[in-house]
Amino acid sequence: MGTDPLIIRNNGSFWEVDDFTRLGRTQLLSYYLPLAIIASIGIFALCRSGLSRYVRSAECDLVNEYLFGAQEERKEDNSIERLLRNSNTQANYVNVKKQGRILKLRHFDITTIDVKQIDAKNHGGLTFSRPSTSDHLRKSSEIVLMSLQIIGLSFLRVTKINIELTNRDVTTLLLFWLILLSLSILRVYKRSTNLWAICFTAHTTIWISTWIPIRSVYIGNIDDVPSQIFYIFEFVITSTLQPIKLTSPIKDNSSIIYVRDDHTSPSREHISSILSCITWSWITNFIWEAQKNTIKLKDIWGLSMEDYSIFILKGFTRRNKHINNLTLALFESFKTYLLIGMLWVLVNSIVNLLPTILMKRFLEIVDNPNRSSSCMNLAWLYIIGMFICRLTLAICNSQGQFVSDKICLRIRAILIGEIYAKGLRRRLFTSPKTSSDSDSISANLGTIINLISIDSFKVSELANYLYVTVQAVIMIIVVVGLLFNFLGVSAFAGISIILVMFPLNFLLANLLGKFQKQTLKCTDQRISKLNECLQNIRIVKYFAWERNIINEIKSIRQKELRSLLKKSLVWSVTSFLWFVTPTLVTGVTFAICTFVQHEDLNAPLAFTTLSLFTLLKTPLDQLSNMLSFINQSKVSLKRISDFLRMDDTEKYNQLTISPDKNKIEFKNATLTWNENDSDMNAFKLCGLNIKFQIGKLNLILGSTGSGKSALLLGLLGELNLISGSIIVPSLEPKHDLIPDCEGLTNSFAYCSQSAWLLNDTVKNNIIFDNFYNEDRYNKVIDACGLKRDLEILPAGDLTEIGEKGITLSGGQKQRISLARAVYSSAKHVLLDDCLSAVDSHTAVWIYENCITGPLMKNRTCILVTHNVSLTLRNAHFAIVLENGKVKNQGTITELQSKGLFKEKYVQLSSRDSINEKNANRLKAPRKNDSQKIEPVTENINFDANFVNDGQLIEEEEKSNGAISPDVYKWYLKFFGGFKALTALFALYITAQILFISQSWWIRHWVNDTNVRINAPGFAMDTLPLKGMTDSSKNKHNAFYYLTVYFLIGIIQAMLGGFKTMMTFLSGMRASRKIFNNLLDLVLHAQIRFFDVTPVGRIMNRFSKDIEGVDQELIPYLEVTIFCLIQCASIIFLITVITPRFLTVAVIVFVLYFFVGKWYLTASRELKRLDSITKSPIFQHFSETLVGVCTIRAFGDERRFILENMNKIDQNNRAFFYLSVTVKWFSFRVDMIGAFIVLASGSFILLNIANIDSGLAGISLTYAILFTDGALWLVRLYSTFEMNMNSVERLKEYSSIEQENYLGHDEGRILLLNEPSWPKDGEIEIENLSLRYAPNLPPVIRNVSFKVDPQSKIGIVGRTGAGKSTIITALFRLLEPITGCIKIDGQDISKIDLVTLRRSITIIPQDPILFAGTIKSNVDPYDEYDEKKIFKALSQVNLISSHEFEEVLNSEERFNSTHNKFLNLHTEIAEGGLNLSQGERQLLFIARSLLREPKIILLDEATSSIDYDSDHLIQGIIRSEFNKSTILTIAHRLRSVIDYDRIIVMDAGEVKEYDRPSELLKDERGIFYSMCRDSGGLELLKQIAKQSSKMMK
């Protein structure tokens, strides 16, 4: 064995010319390297105990979270419970603030949720992945091969064969392999990621080192045969071992896998090998399945345990409890991931520059005519080095981006989860915004949805922006350093240009951020307005406001587009700077070199410099764009932060828990809607001292606007407590409550006046996630009078009721809401006027069998009602309110003794037949009878599937396969047609030709060997620079070359900016036309479209999809065209230089085609699923915000938070695997690109005699560009196609069935010459039949009746009889199957819809108000003067006659604070939430009175108003509309008993039609029985008789 150092060639050096020396191979590779690895293993072993504890703790964090749930939080809860039970604190009702804080945490804090048991359902479970037979075989092979290596080294050590290694080297290697074998054996018995990582890292390092002596053997630098045999043997062993290592699972033994209980296939991410992780092969099976079958949501694999939103939010909340700044909290949560990402960025940036350095060395060899064989060896080494660098770059780039995507996914989950939780816990009623707050966030529904749909996604993408930004900064620094190394002082010229560009780019980025903020503000306004319109689409259609609203939204849209135009201008300037900067930097640098330093350029230096400046171009562009994106994200982050900083509900602070948990009372309590209301005369509940009777029926009575609903909200903690106290029995979360022996819990249930329902089945709305008890459920159905309704519904209680219960009548919605409250286990039930929406039959049944029936035994019921005559019986306690104060209270007997109730209201008529004529025992109609009778405001449109399985809401359409050419043609039509596209292509091609011309011009310059340096005026010593040679005579002046170079670059930059502007202008034109077209189509769609399409889904089109077309589609279209033309030109250029490359290009094209096809197929479907799974998030959020008061009343916040997280996870699954598919594709494209560089360099070397260094530089430079260009072409086209998915989704709405606004073509009547139509108001219905869908049976059958001009007609009947459907037909929301409706003799089907609807006025059952002011709601389009508005308000008793006189006598705007309705600019909250329902209804009636219609329709318009106000309104109708025809649907028979005629409907048919007095003569008639069951038969007879006499 050789030991003599004298025989070592070039003693003391590790490298000579083209290879490692013997010293390098022996000492560096065979001694120092193994020794360093052994030392590292030893150091790790010494620190093992501490490290293993840390690693094990980190690894088991989530496992412990699953196994032990929220035990720590329970400990804190238990401490509070002990505090509550402490007698010392009972006297003071506990520390309210601390109690409130803890209670709020228990309701809303995600950390309090036990993951193992969520609402009696597991979230998921842990399982183990066991090693397979192949895994065991790999381990055995690994041990055998290492043993062979040890045997070989031992043989060398014993036999002392003479090789170039010393005994010391062999001994070190032997020790290294023995340690590695010991660790491998230990891994068999002990599961440890650390041991696997040590073995893999050590072996990979040694394996790489064995390539060096093998190369020495190959090029003949190792002469002795024994050494050759040893190195070959070592290389074979390590090379055989390496695939085993690469394909072994990262964790040797069993791996923990988290499996969801929804049967989702678990993620393969953590059970894959290192090779699979590096190459992303673990997703290949999924991508392959996507080629065979269309991907559905159920086919997408699950996430890793740590990527499920519940674990993300738990960790985020726990780590950041004491951090109030959202930005700092996010940074604190992801600082480790950010650090890892930055490390990948650093390695990526360095490796990215190595090919350019190697290319310079390669070109120097090509440029040297006296090349030796050693130089050729180096040239091949450089080409192989470039190939390896490209492969390494592929790994680094994909892994770094993957870390960013992980952060993006988790930030998205955090932001949506936090915004949702904030929406649940925010204060409902806040002070109005002042003018100074105009720029702050307005937390209406549309804005909050915008925060989720746009802002949260922009902020989540910040991780990717930061990754690219840091990469760009590092690249710029390193490139500048290399330029200085190659060019010397002249590099500072280029650096100066860059430094000048930085402030410009930063300024432009700030401008983009500013315009983005303006754009988002306009987008908020547009989405809010549109959302409000869609939520109330029926009101819009009734009043024919479509065109007005379209104009309003278009006006906002125009402002939005102006902001986008400003952004486009800035983008164009940015594009110009991007193209011109490399030219300026390169040209100025070359000018300094030639004119100042008096040196000539050669090909290696010129093309290396050019390549470096090309590399510099990308990070400069990225830096500018990323700064812009970061600014946009900053704006979005601030908007989210502002929303999250809004006030939380004070419910848990201002409600006091009774020590004995058995009290509900107000103690000297004063409450307001707004905490800091500056109006001292604003409505308040003042000085309340009420003690409700526990376990009894308590009534809250009073006139409209007296504060009845407000009192219930105050009891629920939703109003602001100014003084006093409110005592309640409990505030525990629903799922922490323990039932008593009767199955009841000490909690509240709430039924609001406007029924709030989920878009779900009837059954699920009633069960409301309580334990299902079939017997109790059936009793509740019966008690609430729903039995017959469920028999009629197509799928019974499994029928989907649609968004906001769209398929149900008002009475059905109210009864389902009541059933939910009664079915709950709550001991205390709050009912807000739940009897007003049902007919007299049903009201009696509900009161006797539900409210006072056995289901309410031992339960407290607090009932707000106007139906005094019905509810006084069996009630125990009553409170009478007047103007926010308690007028009277006491037991019913006490109040009657005071003469409070008039005898006619409390006298109850006999109900002997009630058991025979109850709400549920009426015979259900035949199957061919009416399936569902709708109220006017709530129409149903069934389809065949709905009839069969009860499903109403159609699943969102998802196209399969590639985007249809029709979609591209549709978009191109708006874009400007083929002419615009051809013109743009011409601009792009011209710009690319100019770009290539610059490289050819440089080659022409450097090949001119006689360039003179003619720079008089410069007197600077020449600096010695590598690669530069002096020359005294030139063919052309250097100034000539520089001038042409600058000229080409500037023209190219101007074209670049111009083409960007033209592309954006064309895109904005398309975006504007698409939006206008979509808006017109949606608002003029048939009502059936809104019944089967959730508003959240429509809003997703108008928010996310429009935003995609506005701001994402065009930039991707621009760069896709750019890359396409770039790749085509590069292939042509390289083929001209090296024709052999054409063969490689064909092979590469085939590879790209198949890889791209696989990628596009999978990514396209995943992108579509990503888009589709966003809609349920928005829809669920919209539903939650509307019903937040009910959710909080039930204490059911946790379940809704968890449901939101489930929907986030659905979306994140699609997003995550889309991002992984992108990594799979980009790695393979980068790998193919690496082979392109290798092939290009090889062709140059094989044809080196015929290629000069200039052509070689162009060929190699563009080969590298082709790699990046091809990668970005497919990726950008894929992203462009994914964004075209938004266009596809928008195009789907282009085929929405439209209402026939101009009437039927045949015999159309526009009535343009009759502006006063109708003159008389005569209505004639002949043989009318109606149905909701073509494939459904009629709901109205052969109805005929005639209404004389100026007559008053009442329409009565049981809930669901078809009353409101008749009204709907008058507005042509339903078109007749047979028959017709005539008004003044004109068939309304032939009349223009706008004319028809503006000629009829409706006052619907649900009072709908829009966010704004009193004036904007009463007179939205400034058609009337203020005095007329005040007159209408006076007519409905919202202002008194005295106040109206004051208004008439006042010449200035009247702003009295004594009555809010005297100030027409009083703010109205969205939905009118700051008014009582009665006040909302009166305001709506005032709106209708202004129109002075000839025909007025009232659909339960006074159901939510007290009897006195009802009587007043009826009087107004009779006096003010004495020349109008009136049709009134009423459950209060008193309201219509004095009408001219009564229509009695049942099962879609007219059963009775006559004068009320005549109908009451028939004791067997339906009307008679209804009057008898109402409790005032004699009184009704008397009124009808008097009315009949007056008419005679």
UniProtKB/Swiss-Prot annotation:
Cytoplasmic side: 55-74, 122-131, 192-329, 401-465, 511-572, 636-989, 1073-1115, 1159-1229, 1274-1592
Subcellular localization, as worded in the UniProt entry: Vacuole membrane
Residues annotated as domain ABC transmembrane type-1: 338-632, 981-1282
Annotated ranges, domain ABC transporter: 664-908, 1323-1572
Membrane topology, record value: Multi-pass membrane protein
UniProt-listed SUPFAM superfamilies: ABC transporter transmembrane region, P-loop containing nucleoside triphosphate hydrolases
GO cellular-component term (any): fungal-type vacuole membrane
Top-rank taxon, per record: Eukaryota
GO function term, MF aspect, one: ATP binding
CDD domains xref list: ABC_6TM_VMR1_D1_like, ABC_6TM_VMR1_D2_like, ABCC_MRP_domain1, ABCC_NFT1
GO biological process, one term: xenobiotic detoxification by transmembrane export across the plasma membrane
Record field: transmembrane: 34-54, 75-95, 101-121, 132-152, 171-191, 330-350, 380-400, 466-486, 490-510, 573-593, 615-635, 990-1010, 1052-1072, 1116-1136, 1138-1158, 1230-1250, 1253-1273
Induction: Under the control of the iron homeostasis regulating AFT1 and AFT2 transcription factors. Up-regulated upon SUB2 overexpression.
Binding site for ATP 1: 702-709
Sorted UniProt keywords: ATP-binding, Glycoprotein, Membrane, Nucleotide-binding, Repeat, Transmembrane, Transmembrane helix, Transport, Vacuole
Binding residues annotated for ATP 2, in chain numbering: 1357-1364
Positions glycosylated per UniProt: 11, 370
Vacuolar side, ranges: 1-33, 96-100, 153-170, 351-379, 487-489, 594-614, 1011-1051, 1137, 1251-1252
Similarity remark: Belongs to the ABC transporter superfamily.
Record's subunit section: ABC transporter which may be involved in multidrug resistance.
Protein name, entry field: ABC transporter ATP-binding protein/permease VMR1
Lineage of producing organism: Eukaryota, Fungi, Dikarya, Ascomycota, Saccharomycotina
